[in-house]
Amino acid sequence: MTIDANHYDVIVAPVITEKATMASEYNKVVFKVARKATKPQIKEAVEKLFDVKVKSVNTLVRKGKTKVFRGRLGSHSDNKRAVVTLEEGHRIDVTTGL
């Protein structure tokens, strides 16, 4: 089992929110992923980096918000999240890191 450097480019960061923490009770983990990452790439990266079996991957694109900063309009970038469902008996503790 070799870890490719591209796997680190696919998974950007874990998402630690109240909703993501509640999803962990159902064997689901939420990651912020690269915009161009596909579901098979995300599945392979999670399986190799964390040594777990992935059951399914669902992705969503969150649109960036428009904000006012110092009287000027600006915007946050769009970002992509992946909700990864793990097989029974597999766990990922996102607080430990890679």
From Swiss-Prot:
Q: Would you name any one GO CC term?
A: ribosome
The UniProt entry, under Pfam families, shows: Ribosomal_L23
What's a BP term from Gene Ontology annotated to this protein? translation
Key words, A-Z: Ribonucleoprotein, Ribosomal protein, RNA-binding, rRNA-binding
Task: Name the SUPFAM superfamilies on file.
Answer: Ribosomal proteins S24e, L23 and L15e
Q: Which GO terms describe its molecular function?
A: rRNA binding; structural constituent of ribosome
Q: Which domain of life is it from?
A: Bacteria
Q: Which family does it belong to?
A: Belongs to the universal ribosomal protein uL23 family.
Biological function: One of the early assembly proteins it binds 23S rRNA. One of the proteins that surrounds the polypeptide exit tunnel on the outside of the ribosome. Forms the main docking site for trigger factor binding to the ribosome.
Subunit note? Part of the 50S ribosomal subunit. Contacts protein L29, and trigger factor when it is bound to the ribosome.
Q: Which PANTHER family match?
A: 60S RIBOSOMAL PROTEIN L23A
- State what protein this is by name: Large ribosomal subunit protein uL23
Q: Which organism is it from?
A: Nitrobacter winogradskyi (strain ATCC 25391 / DSM 10237 / CIP 104748 / NCIMB 11846 / Nb-255)
Its organism's taxonomic lineage begins at: Bacteria, Pseudomonadati, Pseudomonadota, Alphaproteobacteria, Hyphomicrobiales
